Design a protein with these regions (language model features):
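N-terminal loops that bind phosphate or other acidic moieties
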Residues: 1-120, 124-343
């Protein structure tokens, strides 16, 4: 079930036991792929579609969203340079470009946006963001006051550096179709691009080693070095957009969840981000997920309640994973838990 469906099921469960209680639903994404869709469900926006250069240099239609006040644009690099835009047998990271990302950014600035929030998951590229830089240079924006006056925030959930054995080429390029030899060449290209950038005085050698610069085939590096972007965890950006801190001020309990909760939950996933905000606000936080693996005890140590919505349901996994089953089990779990509340 989707985040929205999980919220709806939880609300039904609460009201079946506590009909007078107010439930505020906030369907949440971690800010990766799907960022724009999630933002559009949270705040009023207007979609904008433009033709840009795709990852393999063919024209593609890229859609992003502009807040109705015209101030902020929300976009995903995958809309212009994503892996899903390239057939599996046509994936060539040695040729793939982020040029279209630069065109999207330029279009948003030309539309008058003063802030751009961009998710950089799902890339087909490994050009270090060089294509994006070229696009902005070609339209005269790269060194302009307009781009200097634009705040760019990047939803980035990987901490890889630009190059090296833990960098963009070695870690991510094989997933994009690169051979072992191409991985080595791509890494050399990224080093060369960083060196050229340093010679221009735009970055220092330390910049390429910063966490997140290797994201999206090194696009994180170009955004940081050339556009002075701020790299933030995707969930933190989404929580801010949702006005989460103010929303939970009057809450008695906050409930979050995911398909399966385990040690990876505490590595920047939605539930982890929600938990951290709740701890700051001194609010009880429940974790209700489809499955729980807490052998290390990290979940029970950080959440006030940790529970699988499928506890007591012995039906086979394929049935438990069906949307209707999951929603009913969410309703029942929440309803039963609310029997013990005094609110």
């Amino acid at each position: 079930m989707s985040a929205e469906e999980a919220c709806n099921a939880a609300a039904i469960g609460v009201h079946s036991t506590l009909p007078g209680v107010e439930v505020v639903a906030l369907p949440m994404s971690d800010g990766g792929e799907g960022l724009v869709e999630c933002v559009r469900k949270m705040i009023p926006t207007t979609p904008r579609s433009i033709m840009v250069v795709g990852p393999m240099s063919k024209k593609v239609e890229a859609t992003y969203a502009i807040a109705t006040d015209g101030y902020t644009a929300y976009m995903e690099m995958a809309a212009a340079s994503g892996l899903t835009l390239v057939a599996e047998n046509e994936r060539k990271p040695m040729m793939a470009t982020t040029y279209g990302v630069g065109e999207m950014i330029a279009d948003a600035i030309q539309q008058g946006c003063k802030k751009i929030v961009i998710g950089i998951g799902g890339s087909a590229t490994c050009d270090g963001g060089k294509g994006m830089v070229e696009a902005l240079r070609n339209c005269g924006l790269l060194s302009s006051d307009a781009i200097k006056d634009t705040k760019i925030v990047v939803a980035c959930d990987v901490d890889n550096p630009l190059y090296g054995k833990n960098g963009a080429a070695y870690i991510f390029a094989p997933q994009k179709g690169a051979t072992k030899e191409e991985v080595e060449l791509l890494d050399k290209r990224l080093r060369s691009f960083a060196h050229d950038t340093e010679l221009l005085g735009i970055a220092t050698p330390a910049t390429a080693l910063l966490p997140g610069t290797g994201a999206a085939g090194g696009l994180g590096y170009a955004l940081l070095a050339y556009l002075k972007a701020e790299l933030k965890a995707g969930i933190e950006i989404m929580l801010d957009i949702a006005n989460f801190d103010n929303t939970i001020m009057d809450a008695d309990i906050v409930v979050t969840g995911e398909g399966k909760s385990d040690h990876q939950t505490m590595m920047g996933k939605v539930a982890h981000g929600v938990m951290k905000r709740c701890r700051k606000a001194n609010k009880p936080i429940w974790l209700l997920s489809g499955a729980i693996d807490d052998e290390e005890g990290m979940l029970s140590k950080n959440f006030d309640l940790v529970k699988s919505i499928n506890d007591g349901d012995s039906r086979p996994l394929p049935i438990l994973m069906q949307k209707e089953t999951a929603m009913k089990n969410m309703e029942k779990t929440i309803s039963d838990l609310c029997l013990h509340l005094n609110i």
